[in-house]
């Protein structure tokens, strides 16, 4: 089974995609991760894809335009197979329930704007990657961390991801892909049987 993992290239998306790919490979899936702006992703042959995951980070209330444009250009492929949208944000880990609800609303609006109806949607907490931020971004993120009572020590990164929950969602996605492949194979078998009896 071939699962395609797509991401908009950010530190959080990469970490989450690596984890999802690792779990799926452990279940026997052939999982390939690509950036949505890569030549490989832009030339994707959807006929060879049994499942698709898109991970994109939410920053300043929006997902990256490149991720949205990729989905809009490939929405038929996404909707033809079991698919999963992983929206990565610090808001998903917020102590404020309104922040968490807003992250979910923004993720659903992203899907609606692209006419994408994935089987799964996960709003996943991201990371504060202080060591990789520019000076301005580090300053802004420290302000957000202070508001959330998280570490403001910019010498180390902080991960808020609930990896066990992400693994559970990944296992569910793997089961959905396997079942979809089983049903498709069964339908093709019946179709070939009907063709030989006519």
Segments from the language model and where they lie:
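Residues at alpha-helix caps and immediate loop-helix transition turns in enzyme cores, especially N-
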Residues: 16, 45, 63-67
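Flexible, glycine-rich phosphate/dinucleotide-binding loops
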Residues: 11-12, 40-42, 92-94, 130
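A short, aliphatic-rich alpha-helical micro-motif
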Residues: 46-47, 78
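A short beta-strand-loop structural module common to alpha/beta enzyme folds
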Residues: 27-42
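Structural motif
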Residues: 50-53, 82
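Glycine- and other small-residue-rich loops at beta-strand/loop junctions that grip anionic moieties
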Residues: 56
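N-terminal beta1-alpha1 ligand-phosphate binding loop
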Residues: 1-29
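FMN-binding flavodoxin-like domain, especially the glycine-rich phosphate-binding loop
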Residues: 3, 26, 59-198
